[in-house]
Amino acid sequence: METNSSLFGLVSPSSHDLVIERLASVGVPKKYRSKRGLVEFVRANPAKISELVSALLPTDDDVKLGLKEARERPRKSAVSPTMKKRFRESMNMLQWLMFQDEPDVSLRNLAKLNLDQRGVCGSVWGQNDIAYRCRTCENDPTCAICVPCFQNGDHNSHDYSIIYTGGGCCDCGDETAWKPDGFCSNHKGSEQIRPLSENLANSVGPILDALFTCWNNKLLSAESSGQKGARSNDTLVILQKMSNELTFIVVEMLLEFSMSSESLLSFVSRRIISSSGLLSILLKAERFLDQDVMKKLHDLFLKLIGDPVFKCEFAKAFVSYYPVVISEVVKQGTDNAFKKYPLLSTFSVQILTVPTLTPFLVKEMNLLAMLLGCLSDIFVSCSGEDGLLQATKLERLCETSERVIGDLKFVMSHAIVSKYATHEHRELSRSWLTLLTFAQGMNPLKRETGIPIDEENDYMHLFFVLGHSIAVIHSLLVNGTYSAASDEEIENDRNAKEEFDKCDGDGERYAKVGRLSHEDSVCTAIVSSSSFDSSMASEVHKIDPFHALLPSSAIYLIRECLKVLETCLGNDEGISKFLCKLSSSSGRNIPESKMSWPRRDLLNVETGGSVSSNLASSSRDPSTGLSPLCGDIQTNLSLDNVCGPYGVVQTDVTADSKRVSCNSADLTKNASGLRILGLCDWPDIHYDVSSQAISVHLPLHRLLSLLIQKALRICYGESASYNGVSISHEIPHADFFSSVIGDFHPCGFSALVMEHVLQIRVFCAQVIAGMWKKNGDSALVSCEWYRSVRWSEQGLELDLFLLQCCAALAPADSYVDKLLSRFGLSSYLSLNPDITNEYEPVLVQEMLGLLIQILQERRFCGLSTAESLRREIIFKLATGDFTHSQLVKSLPRDLSKSDELQEVLDDVSVYCNPSGMNQGKYSLQSSCWKELDLYHPRWQSRDLQSAEERFSRYCGVSALTTQLPRWRMIYPPLKGLARIGTCKATFQIISSALYYALQSGTSVKSRAPDGVLITALQLLSLSLDICTQQRQSNSQDCCLENSIPILELAGLEIIGIAQGTEKESLLSLLVSLMKTRMGDGRHQFPEPGSCNISSWIGNLLKKFSAIDSVCMNLLQSLAPEVVGQSGFDKVMSGSTSDEKRKAKAKERQAAIMAKMKAEQSKFLSTLSSSMDDDDPRSEFETSDSVMEHDSEIAVREVCSLCHDPDSKDPVSFLIFLQKSKLLSFVDRGPPSWDQCPQSEKKISVDGAPDLLRMNASSDSLRISSPLMLQLSDDTISESANMIESIKARLIGNGQTEKRSSDGRGKDESNMESLEIAMYQTVRNKIENMINQSLTRVDHQPHEAENCSEKNSVGGPSTLQGRFPDIRSRQTSRRPDAGSDGFHPIDCDGVYLSSCGHAVHQSCLERYLKSLKERSGRRTVFEGAHIVDLKKKEFLCPVCRRLANSVLPECPGDLCSVSKLQDSPRTKLRRKDALQPSLWLSEALCLLRSAAEVIEDGDRGKTVTPQGDGPRRKDLKSVSKMLWDFYFPKPEDKTLKRLWLPPQSIVMWDTLKYSLISMEIGTRFAKNSMLPVYCIDSLYEELKTSKGTILSVLLRVVQSSRTKNTIHVRQRFVGMKHLAESICYGVSSSSSSSIFGSEGTTGSLKNIDLLWNRASDPVLAHDPFSSLMWALFCLPFPFLTCEESLLSLVHIFHSVSLVQTVIAYCACRPSELSELNFGENLLNDISNALRESGGWEYFRSNNMDLSCDIKDTIRKYSLPFLRRCALLWKLLKSTPRKLHEESDMFDLPSDPTTDNMDFIYSPQSELNHVQELEKMFNIPPIDIILNDELLRSSTQIWLQHFQREYRVNRVKRSLCITPVVPFQLMKLPNLYQDLLQRCIKKRCVNCTKVIEEPVLCLLCGSLCSPIWSPCCRESGCPNHAITCGAGTGVFLLIRRTTILLQRFARQSPWPSPYLDTFGEEDIDMIRGKRLYLNEERYAALTYLVGSHGLDRSSKVLGQTTIGAVLH
C-alpha cells in the first residue's frame, strides 16, 4: 500500500476477513481461527501471544477503512459497523484468551468469589453527588466516603458532615485516607484483597502484558506524531483515531474488570506498573486524546489508586508530569490551556493530601521544590518591569496559580513537610521568601488629586485571594518552624539556661547581643561580619536562655525574612532618598535612644542556603537549579562563597536596578556598604502617603509578625509552662529581641519595619476622611477589605502587632513624632486654632485611636486563648444577637478551632432557643457588657456605633466614659510600650487637642471637635492608668524611666507661649474645659451613647491628684471643688441638685396635665351642644332610625384611596379570592417521606379520579344558541308565574304584606314579602304539629318506593312537562353524584379573605387604570413584582396585601327582618323537657311544609310574568371573578352577555367553603403540630377580618338572592327536590333530563347543578354542605330563626352520624356479620349494608377501630358541629370595624398562648364534642340511636343511596374525616435521610436526572424549580396548578429551604430543618446534621392551612413573579 494514497480511496473489505488474514499471517492454522480454537492455540504456543494480540487488534489500515465508512455512511442504505464495535469484538476475543472461556461467565464467577469481600470501595463520584466527611475517621480534610459506606458504618457518635462532591472517589477501605475503625462492613482495607488465583494469573497476565505493550506503542506514536508533525494529515488523523478508540475500549474493559473482581483489578494495576513507560504515557495522554476518553481513563485511575503500590507509582509519575503542564500553561499565558489538562485538578487532592505519601514525594521526588519552581515560573510571567505581580497578567493565569498554591497548601499541611522545609532543607523556606518579593507591595494605589476617575479594578480581589492563600501557607510554615525539638535538645537547653542564670552583669550580656553559636551558624549559614568569632558564638549559645525554647530554624527564618525585607525596603522611594543622604556618612547617634547596642558597619545584605538542584523545570538555570526570579532578586553562586565545615553555599541577594529609582544605583550595595536595618540612629525618612504609591499587601511583614508573635507566645505565653522552661523576669526584655533579630539594630529595625505598616493605617484613615474619593471605588474597597473580618486577621492585626514591637524598641518621642508625620499632622502641635484642612479632625481622631490600640492591644502579647476567645465573642455580640455559625465565622481562624470555644461561649452569652421563624441565637450576658472594648482593631464605624447604643440601652450609662482603655498585663519584652503613652510627644498631642477644644468650644470648624476631644481624653485616661500601675509597682522595669514625662509636664505652664496667649498647663486646660462643659449633659448629645464631658474630666483630675502629689497641690488651687471637697459635701450637693431636678419635673408634669384637661373640657362642651340640638322626628321614629342604621354606623369606612370622610358614595371592602384544595388535603391525609418520590403529570389529591370536570361535561347534547335564547325567555315567564302563584295563594290565606322601608323597588319588596309569608306559613304548620304532640311521621318503605307516582311533595316535578322538545334530545342518565354539585374548576372551593380596608369602586377603577397605563409604559410601580394585572390583582394601598376584587358593604340587610320569636307554647315545651330530645320531627315538618307551599304555587299560573329582576352593579366585579373560577368561559359570547351568573349562588358556595376552611384552620396552633379542641379558637377567627368579611358576604347574599325571579324559583325548586330526597328518598330526574349539558352556560346550567345537588341522596354528601344549601333554598327568614336552624342542625347531625356508622362498618367488611349492636340504629345500618352493600362509597383514613363505636360516632360528628358553631356565631355577630390590628401571620407566635387554649389529651376531643352538643341541644348518643323516627328515616336514606349506587350514578367516594388538622408531608427527623432519598432521582415525565430536586410537601412528588427545569410538566408552577389549585409548597432539597408558589408568584421561606444550635444550613455549606424543627414546620403548616401565603407581609415582601430565586 502506498503511503501517499488517499485516506478514503480504498474499498473496505470485511473486518472479519481482515482478522482472519492477519491470524493466518502470524501462523494460526485454519482450524484454530475461532475463539475456542485461539484458546487452544495459545495454550500450545505461548510464545505467539504477542503476535496474536497484535493480529487481533485493529490496525491502522482498519482505522483508515473505518474512517472511510464513517464518511460514506450517510450515502449508504445500510449502516456499517462502527470502530468501537470492531474494537469491542477484538477485546472480546482477547478476553477469551485471558479467561480461556466465555468472558461474561468468567467475570460472574469472579464476582461470586469476591462477594462482600472487597477491600476498597473506590466508587467514582460525579458532580454534586452526596458524600460524607467524618472528622473522627478521616486522615485529612479532603477525604470522604459514599452514602452506602457511611450507612454501613458506625458514625453515629462521630463528627461527620454531608458534602456535595466535585468528583473523586470513595476512600472507604483506603488506609492512607481513612482510619480502619471507620471502614464500613463491606470494605476492610487493601490488605484484605485476595490475590488472583495462579492459574488465572498465568492466563490473564501474558495477554494483558501484550495488550499493554501495543497500547503503549500506539500512544507513543500518537504523541510523537503530534509533537513532531506527521508526514500527512491523514496519518495524524489515523494515529489519533487509533489511540482514542483503543484507549476507550481498553479502559472500558478494565472498568468492567473492576466492577467484577477487586482481585483482578489489583492484578491489572500491578501489570500496568510493570509495563515499561505505560503509566507515564497514560498521564500525558490528555494532551492528545479526546475529553470523553480521558474522562473514562480518569475513572479508571480513581479505581486503581485504591491499591497502595499503584498509588505510589502513580504519584511519582504525577509529580514528574506536573511541571510539564505548568510550563506549557505559562508558555501560552492563559488558563484556557490549563483547562485542557484536567489531570492536575482531579488528582492533586488524591495524591498530595495522603499523610504517608506526600512526605515521601517531598524527600524522594523534590515535590516541594518542584511546586516552588512552578509558582516561580508563574510569578515571573505575571510580573511587570518593577518585579511586582500585575493584575491583568495574574488574571489570565488565575486558575493555574490557585491550583499551584492550593497544592502547596496541601503539601505544607503535613507537619513533617513543613518541618522538613524549615529544619532540614532551609533553602526551601528561603526560596519561599524570595517568591514573596513578587507580592510585596503589589497593586499599589496613588491618590488622584485632579479630575475624578471612575476606575473599577475588576481584578482587585485576586490580590486579596492570593494574600489569603499566602497567609495560610505562612501559618503552616510557622507551625513547622516552631515544631517541638527532641527531648535531648530540650534537656541541653535547660542546662544552658541554668548556667546563664548564674551569670550577672549587663556588660557581659550586652557584649554578646546578636551573636549566634557555631552550630547555629552552620545550620543557618548566616555570616554577619568577617570578624565573627565562632568560639564566642558558642559561648553565647551556652548562656542564651531563649535558645532553650526557640528552635534555631525559627531564628533563622526571622533573620532571613528581615534580610529579604531589607532588600525590598531599599526600593521604597522615601527610604531610597534617605539612603542617598546617608551614603556619605556612617550615621549619627540619636540622643533619645537609651539602647547601647553595639554599632555595626553597614554591610551588604547576604543570605545563605544551599539551593536544591532538583527543581525540575525547563527554564531553570543549570548552575543553580532555580528558576530565574524577578529582576530585583538575583542569585550569584560560586565556589568562593562556600564556607564552614559542611561547605554551605552563600547566596548574595542584590536589588535590581529596576526596583531602585535613585540615580539608577543599587543603594543596598553602595560604596559605603549601607545596611538598612542596621542603622544605629533613628532615621529621618520623609514620606507623604497622599502623594506617593501605597499598597496594603505586605506578605513579608505578615510572615515576620507571625514568627515574632509565635516566639513571644512560646517564651511568655501559655505554651511556655508546657516545656518546663520559663524566662526569668529579671532578664531585660531587650534580650529577647536581640536573640531574635540578631545584629539588626533596634532603631533601624523599628523605624524601617514599621514604615509600610504605618503607611497602610494612614491610608485607611485618609480613605475614611474622604481624601481618596477621586480614585473611585478602588481605594475604598481596598480599605474596607483590609479592615474586614475576613482579611483583618491576616493583615491588620499582624500589622498592629508589628507596630507594637517597633514601639517597644523605638525611642518613644521619635516613634510618636513619626506617627504625626505620616498622618500629615506635624502642624497640629502649632496651637494655631484655625483649621488647616477639612480632613484634619478625622485624621487626628484616627491617629489617636491608633495610639490607643498600640498601647492596649493584647491579642498576641498578653491574652491567653480563652481570654482572646472571650474578648472576640463579646466584641461580636455587642453589636447584636448571632447564630453559632456566625459567631464562629467572625472569629480568627486559630481561635475558631479552639477546644475552649463552646465553654467560653456559654460563659459570656445566653442562648435563645429557636422560636417561630427565628433561629437559635446567642446574646451577650448583662454582666459581660463591662468588658466591651471600644478600641478593638476590627471595629467598623457602623458596628461601633451600634455597640455604643446597645451598651447605653442595657447599662444606662455611656460607654465612652465607662469603657475606658486600660493598661493590662503584657509580655515583658513589650513593656517598653508604656513609654509611648507617657512620653512628651503624646503629652503634646493631648494638650493640643484640649487647647483647640477649649479655644473653639463646640464650634463645627474646631480643630478638636467632640470626637477628637473624647478620643484624646480616652488616651489621657489610658496614660494615667499606665502611670498608676507604674507608681504602684514595687520595682521598676529596667526599660522604663524612673520619671514619667506626662506627670512632670502636666503642671508646667508651657502651652501657648509661642502664640502669645495666656500660658496654660495640661491641668489648667482640663479645669477650664471642665468648667466650660459644665452645662452639657445628655441634652447636648442627643445620640445614644453620649456622655457628660465635664464630669469625666473631673474624674481625670482626681486621678492626677491621686497619682502625683505635685498635681494634687496644683489642682487644689485650680479646682478646689474637685479635689478639696469632702465626701459629705459631695453627697449634700448631689442631693440638693437631685431635689431641684425633681421639683422642675413635677412642675412640667402639672402644666401638661392642666393643658390636657382644658382641651378635654372644650371637646366635651362641643359634643354636648351638638347632642342638645332639636330633632324634628318623633321619639319612636328616632328609635327605629337608630336601630336600623346602627350597624351601618358601626361598619362605616373611609375610602383608602381618596380618604374623603364626607363622601356619600358607598364603599366596598378589598377582598382576595383564591382557589383552594384544603378540604381534599385534609380528607386524604399527609403523604409520608418514605414513600417513593414521584413526579406525575396529573395528581389526584384524594386518590380517586377527578370527577369535577366530568360533572361539568355530561353526556347531554349541546343546545343550540337560538333554542337557548327561546328557552331563557320561557324560563323567565315560568319563574314569574310560579312566584306570583305562591304569592297570591299565601296572601289570599290572610297573610299581610310587609313593605320595605329602605327605598327598594316594588318587585324586590314583593318577593321579600312573599318569603316572609312562606316563612310564617311553615312556622304555623310546625307549631300545629308541636301542639298536637306529633312525635312521629309515617314513613313506610312502600310509600317511599311509590312516592314518585304520587302527586304530592315527592311526586314528579312539574317541570317535566315544560320542554318536551329538549327532553327528547337529552339522555336520561344524570351526572355523577360524587361532587357537591356546584364546584369551581380543579379545586374544592373558593376561599374569601380580606385585609379589612375599603375603597370607592370608582376610585379603585381609576387606580387600576393608572397601574395598567404604567405597566404598559414599563414604568415601575409598587407591587409590580407581586401582582398580575391581567388577573386584576393589586395591592391594598394601606397594608400592601394582595387583593383581586371588592365586596360592597351591606349594612342592615341581615337584620332587615326582625328575628321572629318562638311561641310561648314552644318555649314552655322545650323548657319543661327533662332532657334534650332529637328535633327530627320539626326538621322534617319544616322541609315538607316548605315543599308543599312551593308545590302548590307551582301548579297555579294565574299571574302575568314580570320578567327578569334587576342585578346589583356593585357585585359585578366579584361575580365575574367567581364565575371565572366556577365555570369555563363559554364559546358563544352572546350567551355570556345575555345570561349573567347568579350572584347569590356562587357567593353562597364561597361562603360555605370559606366557613369550612376557617374551621379546618382552627384545628391546629400556630407553632405546634398538636390539634386544638377549643370553641374559643373558633370564635377568635371570627373576630379577625376573615370572620368579619364573611359576615359582610352573608348580608350581601341575603340582599341579592331575592332580587331575581329566576333565582328565587331556582331556590324554591331546589328546596322541593331537597325535601323529596330527605323526606321520601326520591331523586327528581326532570332537571337532569333538561339541563346540564356541556354546552349550557349561565343560569340554566346553574339551575341544573343546584337541582341535581338537591336531588342527590342525602348520605352522598357532606352534611354541613347539605345544611348550607337547605338554608340557601329556604325563604330567607329561616336563616334568622333560631328554632328552625336548630332543627336543621339536628337532622343533618343525624346524617353525619349515619355516615360515620357506615364508614365504621366499611373498615370492617369481613366482620359485618359478627357485629352485634343490639336493636338500635347501628344494627339497622349493619343489616342494610350486609343485604344491599354500598359501604365501598364511604371511606375513612383515620378510623380507630379499637375505640368504642359510640365515642367514634361522636368524634366524627365534631367537624359538622364545629362548622355549625361558626355559622351560628356568624349569624349572631354584629357588624364592626373590619381592619385587623396586626398581621396574624407576621407576629411571633407565643407557645404559651397557643397551647393554653386547649391542651391535647385523649379525652379532650370528647369534651369538645360535649360542649358543642350542649350548645345545639343534641340529646345523648343512646337516645339518638334508639330514636324510632331517625331509624325509619335512616332506612329511607339508605334505600335512596343504594338505588342510586346500584345504577352506578354515585361514583366518587365520600371521605369521612374526624377533626384532624391539616398537615404537610410527614418529613423525617434527620435531613440526611431525605437528602439521600431524593438526590439524583430521575423525572417520571422526561426520565432526566433532576439536578435540583424539589419535593412537593402537599403530595410528595419530586419536581424541578423554574431556574433549573428538567421538563415543563415537572416544573413547580405547573405542578402547583395541578396539585394545589395554584398553591405549591416545595422543599428545595439541595438548599434545605422552602419555596412557596402561588401560580406565577414565588417566594422563599426559611428552612424547617435546624442544626443542634438551632441554625439553618442553607445549601448544606456546613453539612452538619439537621433536625426537623416542629415549631417551624407547624408555623409553615399553619400559614398554608389558613390560606395565608398571599396575606403575610413576610411572604409578599420576598415574592416575585417568574424571577430566579437565589
From Swiss-Prot:
<dbReference type="InterPro" id="IPR013083">
    <property type="entry name" value="Znf_RING/FYVE/PHD"/>
</dbReference>
<dbReference type="GO" id="GO:0010029">
    <property type="term" value="P:regulation of seed germination"/>
</dbReference>
<protein>
    <recommendedName>
        <fullName>E3 ubiquitin-protein ligase PRT6</fullName>
        <ecNumber>2.3.2.27</ecNumber>
    </recommendedName>
</protein>
<feature type="compositionally biased region" description="Polar residues">
    <location>
        <begin position="1349"/>
        <end position="1360"/>
    </location>
</feature>
<dbReference type="GO" id="GO:0050994">
    <property type="term" value="P:regulation of lipid catabolic process"/>
</dbReference>
<feature type="compositionally biased region" description="Basic and acidic residues">
    <location>
        <begin position="1338"/>
        <end position="1348"/>
    </location>
</feature>
<dbReference type="GO" id="GO:0042742">
    <property type="term" value="P:defense response to bacterium"/>
</dbReference>
<keyword id="KW-0833">Ubl conjugation pathway</keyword>
<keyword id="KW-0611">Plant defense</keyword>
<dbReference type="InterPro" id="IPR055194">
    <property type="entry name" value="UBR1-like_winged-helix"/>
</dbReference>
<dbReference type="GO" id="GO:0008270">
    <property type="term" value="F:zinc ion binding"/>
</dbReference>
<dbReference type="InterPro" id="IPR042065">
    <property type="entry name" value="E3_ELL-like"/>
</dbReference>
<dbReference type="InterPro" id="IPR003126">
    <property type="entry name" value="Znf_UBR"/>
</dbReference>
<dbReference type="GO" id="GO:0004842">
    <property type="term" value="F:ubiquitin-protein transferase activity"/>
</dbReference>
<keyword id="KW-0862">Zinc</keyword>
<dbReference type="Pfam" id="PF18995">
    <property type="entry name" value="PRT6_C"/>
</dbReference>
<dbReference type="GO" id="GO:0016567">
    <property type="term" value="P:protein ubiquitination"/>
</dbReference>
<comment type="pathway">
    <text>Protein modification; protein ubiquitination.</text>
</comment>
<dbReference type="InterPro" id="IPR039164">
    <property type="entry name" value="UBR1-like"/>
</dbReference>
<feature type="region of interest" description="Disordered">
    <location>
        <begin position="1338"/>
        <end position="1380"/>
    </location>
</feature>
<dbReference type="GO" id="GO:0006511">
    <property type="term" value="P:ubiquitin-dependent protein catabolic process"/>
</dbReference>
<dbReference type="GO" id="GO:0061630">
    <property type="term" value="F:ubiquitin protein ligase activity"/>
</dbReference>
<feature type="zinc finger region" description="RING-type; degenerate">
    <location>
        <begin position="1395"/>
        <end position="1440"/>
    </location>
</feature>
<keyword id="KW-0863">Zinc-finger</keyword>
<feature type="region of interest" description="Disordered">
    <location>
        <begin position="1167"/>
        <end position="1186"/>
    </location>
</feature>
<dbReference type="GO" id="GO:0050832">
    <property type="term" value="P:defense response to fungus"/>
</dbReference>
<dbReference type="Pfam" id="PF02207">
    <property type="entry name" value="zf-UBR"/>
</dbReference>
<keyword id="KW-0479">Metal-binding</keyword>
<comment type="function">
    <text>Ubiquitin protein ligase which is a component of the N-end rule pathway with arginine specificity, and functions with the arginyltransferases ATE1 and ATE2. Recognizes and binds to proteins bearing specific N-terminal residues that are destabilizing according to the N-end rule, leading to their ubiquitination and subsequent degradation. Does not participate in degradation of proteins with N-terminal Phe or Leu. The N-end rule pathway regulates seed after-ripening, seedling sugar sensitivity, seedling lipid breakdown, and abscisic acid (ABA) sensitivity of germination.</text>
</comment>
<dbReference type="InterPro" id="IPR044046">
    <property type="entry name" value="E3_ligase_UBR-like_C"/>
</dbReference>
<keyword id="KW-0808">Transferase</keyword>
<feature type="compositionally biased region" description="Basic and acidic residues">
    <location>
        <begin position="1364"/>
        <end position="1377"/>
    </location>
</feature>
<dbReference type="InterPro" id="IPR036390">
    <property type="entry name" value="WH_DNA-bd_sf"/>
</dbReference>
<feature type="zinc finger region" description="UBR-type">
    <location>
        <begin position="119"/>
        <end position="189"/>
    </location>
</feature>
<dbReference type="Pfam" id="PF22960">
    <property type="entry name" value="UBR1-like_wing"/>
</dbReference>
<dbReference type="GO" id="GO:0009737">
    <property type="term" value="P:response to abscisic acid"/>
</dbReference>
<dbReference type="GO" id="GO:0071596">
    <property type="term" value="P:ubiquitin-dependent protein catabolic process via the N-end rule pathway"/>
</dbReference>
<comment type="similarity">
    <text>Belongs to the E3 ubiquitin-protein ligase UBR1-like family.</text>
</comment>
